[in-house]
Regions:
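PIN-domain endoribonuclease scaffold, especially VapC-family toxins
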Residues: 1-85, 89, 103
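Acidic, PIN/NYN-like endoribonuclease modules and their adjacent C-terminal/linker elements
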Residues: 84, 88-115
Length: 115
């Protein structure tokens, strides 16, 4: 699929949370401050990267989708479901390499551009 001029990309706040938790856990595991330097650098790069996108909130509409779908999609991870519900609430296409899990979400439009 070709990207056309003017197309915009957005990222779910839940995706940002996942990435932040990963780097914060890495920083917390390091006992030596000198070893935390690179992880803090990477965390800073992450902030700058995500700042280039529109950030989609996990709002009341997304939460309502989440509450409605939680019971029927128990095997879908909480964060993946939050990401899916954010996309549903914003009525956007979700780009993912994880088609198998996300295609179970009713009404969610997904594509894998890595295929």
């Amino acid at each position: 699929m070709a990207i056309t001029y003017g197309e915009r990309f957005a990222v779910s706040i839940a995706s940002i949370e996942e990435h932040m938790r990963g780097w914060l856990a890495t920083i917390a595991k390091e006992r030596l401050v000198v070893r935390q330097v690179n992880s803090y650098h990477e965390l800073g790069l992450l902030f700058r990267f995500f700042a280039t996108f529109t950030i989609l909130p996990f709002d009341d509409v997304a939460a309502a989708h989440f509450d409605r779908l939680r019971q029927s999609l128990r095997r879908l991870g909480t964060m993946d479901l939050k990401i899916a519900c954010t996309a549903l609430a914003a009525d956007v296409l979700l780009l993912t390499a994880n088609r198998r899990d996300f295609e179970r979400v009713p009404g969610l439009r997904i594509e894998n551009w890595l295929d």
